[in-house]
Amino acid sequence: MDATPNGKDAFVVTAANAAGDPLNWAAAAEALSGSHLDEVKRMVAEYRKPAVRLGGQTLTIAQVAATAAHDQGLKVELAESARACVKAISDWVMESMDKGTDSYGITTGFGATSHRRTKQGGALQKELIRFLNAGIFGNGTESNCTLPHTATRAAMLVRVNTLLQGYSGIRFEILEAITKLLNNNITPCLPLRGTITASGDLVPLSYIAGLLTGRPNSKAVGPSGEILNAKEAFELANIGSEFFELQPKEGLALVNGTAVGSGLASIVLFEANILAVLSEVISAIFAEVMQGKPEFTDHLTHKLKHHPGQIEAAAIMEHILDGSSYIKAAKKLHEIDPLQKPKQDRYALRTSPQWLGPQIEVIRFSTKSIEREINSVNDNPLISVSRNKALHGGNFQGTPIGVSMDNTRLAIASIGKLMFAQFSDLVNDYYNNGLPSNLTASRNPSLDYGFKGAEIAMASYCSELQYLANPVTSHVQSAEQHNQDVNSLGLISSRKTNEALEILKLMSSTFLVALCQAIDLRHLEENLKNTVKNVVSQVAKRTLTTGVNGELHPSRFCEKALLKVVEREYTFAYIDDPCSGTYPLMQKLRQVLVDYALANGENEKNLNTSIFQKIASFEEELKTLLPKEVEGARLAYENDQCAIPNKIKDCRSYPLYKFVREELGTSLLTGEKVISPGEECDKVFSAMCQGKIIDPLLECLGEWNGAPLPIC
C-alpha cells in the first residue's frame, strides 16, 4: 500500500495482485522466468546506466551494486511523486503525538523497555541515536573495523528507497540529504560489526543518523578519501548549515531497517551471478583442453533430470563446445585404440552441469529474495493513515537476508570445489590427456615446476571457502534483554558471503591463468608433434626405403606404423629429450622395426633385406636430426611463427583467452622466465574485481539463442 497525500491508503496495482495473487507466489515465480544468462545481461545493462531513480518499488541489485561501486559519475534521483506520500505520514506522526496517541518508539521506550513513556518525542529520538552508537572502529590500530565504503553507499541507497514508500514517518528532506551525500561521494563511517539484523541494522544505521544530526563522534569520508566531521560533510554535500533535529519517529525510521545487510547482499549477488556464468564457461574450456567427450552436454540427458539450472548450464557448455576445434581434434584421438581408453570422463568434467545447476538456482532465487527485500518496508511500527494507527510488527527481521546469504555462500563454496577438482585434474599428468605435469612449459622439466605452487594455493583457497560455507544463521544469540530472542544475523552472513566471493575470485583467476597455459601447451604440443612426425617420416624415407644397392627395401613398409607411434604417444612424455632410450618414443619406434623384422622371415638372413640391419642407421639419423628440429619448432613457437595456428582462435571461448593474454598481457609461464604464476594470476584477479571480465565473458555467449541444440 502507498499512502496518498489526502491521508488515504491505496493498494499499489501490481501484476501480482491484479492477477489474483494475494500471497505473491505467482509474482515470485514470474520473476524467475527466462534464462539466467538473459537475467545477468539485464543486470549488466542496469549496472552501466548513469542514473538510479528511486521510487520505492523498482530498485534492483544491479542498481545497488552500481551505486556502491560508482562513487563518481552516477546520479541518484528521487521520484518527486513520493514527496507528498512521505509528508502525509510524517504529518500523521506529529498529529498523533499532539493528540497524545500512544505509539511505540514515539511515546514509548524501545525494545524490552517499551513500558516506559515520554512526551519528549524529539529527545527520545536523540537518545536512540546516542545509545545505538555502540560500534568500535579501532582507530589507530592495525585492525580495520569500519564497514567498507561500498557497503555503506549500498545501505544508504536501500534505506532511502524503503523510506520513500511512505509508511515510516520521516521528512522527505532527510531522504534528500542522504541522496546528496551519495551524489557528492561523501560516505558516513559505519562500524563493521555490531548488528544482528533483527530490529534492523540498528547500530550501523545509527551512524548515518548521527551524521545527519551532527553528533560530535560522527565521521565521514570525502571524495578524495579525506576524513570529515559532520559540519564539513554537510557543507561539501550542499545540504545546508543546519543539522536535522529529529522529530518523533524519525530516528527509528532511519535505524530500524535491514538496509546494511541487504545492501551488501545486493553487491555480493551481482558478482555471484556473473561468477556463476563464468564457472559454466570455464567448465566448457576445461572440457576443451582436457580433450573431453562433449556428449555430457547432450540435451536429452538434462531434460530427463528436469532441473532448469542444470539444463541451462549444460546448454551453455554445449554452445561453447559446439564446433570447437579442440572437440573435433579430440574426437579423432578418441577413435584411436578406443577399447584401451576410458569410456567416459571423470566427474569434474562429465557432471559439471549437474553440479553447477543447483548452485545457479540457489543464487538466482537468493537474488530475487534480496531484490524483494530492498523494495520492502522493513521498519516498525508502520503507519496506516486510513486506519489511523501504527501497526506494530516485525518487518525489521532480516531473515530473508541471513537465509539467502547462507545459501549463496554454500553455492559459492560448491562452485569453488568444482573448480579445485577441475584444476587438480588439469595439472595432473595422470588425468590430463597428455599435458605436462604441473603444466610445465620449459625445455627442462627438472627446472620447471609450473603450477605446483598454484595448486597448493588453490587447496588453501578451497579449504577456507569450505569453512566459510558453514551457516551463520544457526548461531543466533538472544539479545536486548531477551526481546530480540531470535535474530537473523543478516549482515554477518552477508559479510561472510562477501569473503567467500573474494576467495572464489582468487580461484577463478588462478584457474583462468592455468587454462590459458593449457591452451598454449596444446598449441605447442600440436606443433611439436607435427615436427616429430615430419622428422620421423623424412628419416624413414631416407634410411628405410632402399637397400645398399638402391633396391626397394622391406623396411619401407614401416613408415606408416612409425607415424602411428608418434600420433599415439603423448608428446610431452618425451619431448624434453626426444631421443632418450628411457623415454617411450624411441622405445616404441624401435619396437615397430623389431616387430616388422620378426615378421620378415627368411629375408632377415640376407643383409640386403634385413630390417634389423636398418634399425641402427634409422636411430642414428633420428638422433642427429630430431633434437635440432624440435628446438627449431620451440623457437618458432616463441617467435609466433608456428606452422600450425592456435586452435583457440576458432573457438567460442576465444574472447576469454584473448582477454587474459592480450588485454591483460599475460604469457606462457616457464621456469626459463622470471615472472611467477602469482604475478599473472594477480592481473586477472584485479581485472575481475574491476568488472573487466564481464564483456569477454558475455562475448563467448553472444551467439547463444537461449536454447539447447536440437536432440538428433
From Swiss-Prot:
User: What domain of life does the UniProt record list for this protein's source?
Assistant: Eukaryota
For this protein, the record's InterPro entries field holds: Aromatic_Lyase, Fumarase/histidase_N, L-Aspartase-like, Phe/His_NH3-lyase_AS, Phe_NH3-lyase, Phe_NH3-lyase_shielding_dom_sf
Q: Where in the cell is it found?
A: Cytoplasm
User: What general EC class does the enzyme of this chain belong to?
Assistant: lyase
Q: What is its EC number?
A: 4.3.1.24
Q: Which GO terms describe its cellular component?
A: cytoplasm
Q: Which residues form the active site?
A: Y104
S-S bridge residues: none
According to UniProt, the reaction catalysed is: L-phenylalanine = (E)-cinnamate + NH4(+)
Share what the entry says about its subunit structure, partners included: Homotetramer.
Family, according to the entry, reads as follows:
Belongs to the PAL/histidase family.
Q: What does this protein do?
A: This is a key enzyme of plant metabolism catalyzing the first reaction in the biosynthesis from L-phenylalanine of a wide variety of natural products based on the phenylpropane skeleton.
Q: What protein does this entry describe?
A: Phenylalanine ammonia-lyase class 2
Q: Which organism is it from?
A: Phaseolus vulgaris
